[in-house]
C-alpha cells in the first residue's frame, strides 16, 4: 500500500513555546486517519505545516513521496483541505461560491462539476440562500465541496464536527465514508471528540503535548478498549476450569507462576 503522508521528527516553536516536538506519523493510501488530541495539542499547527501554511523548524514531511520544493507544489495540487473554518464568501450562494473557485483554479466544465459536487455533498437544493445564512452543517459541507472541486486524492479536515448537532454529525460521517469508499480518497480528520473519530477512522494517531504518542489501528483500538476483570486465585487450574466450562468466558493466564 502506497504512503500518502510521512512525517519524521517534526518540531515547531512559537517563541519559547514548543507546539510540536519530534513528531512522526504515517498515513497510507485509503486510510481514514483520525488525529485525536485535546484543544491546544497542536493539531491545527500540524495540518498547517502539511499544507505549507506554516513551516516546521525541524523534521521532514513527505507528501506522495515528494519532499523537494519543485515536487511539493505538484503534490499539494492533489490535496483538498478545510482548515479551522470553510473559506467562502458570505454574500454568495453555494453555486456562486463554487463558480468563483472554479474560475481561480481554471477548472474546465465548471457548470457540470459544480452541479455534481453540490449534489454529492447535499447542497443542490439551497437555491438563492447565501453562505451567511447557512447552518453550521451546511457551511461545513460547502467547505468540503470547495475542497473537492479539484478532485483531490487526499482530503484534510481540521475539527470538522465542532458545533454540529447529532443529525449533522451523522450526515457528515456518512458523507466522509462515501468519499473514502466510492471515490477512494485518503482522509485525515482531526478532532478532540474520540467517540466520533472512532466511528469514522480505521487508523488513529494520538497527539499529546505536541507529540504523537501512539499510532494504532482500529482493531488495536478495540482491543485496548475491551472491558476486563482481573482475577487473582490460589487455585489456577480450578479457576480455569470454572471459567471455561461453567461461565464460558474468554480468559488469559497472565502470571502462571503465581
Locate the predicted segments by residue.
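Primarily ABC-family ATPase nucleotide-binding module
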Residues: 1-3
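A structural detector for beta-sheet-dominated domains
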Residues: 8, 28, 231-234
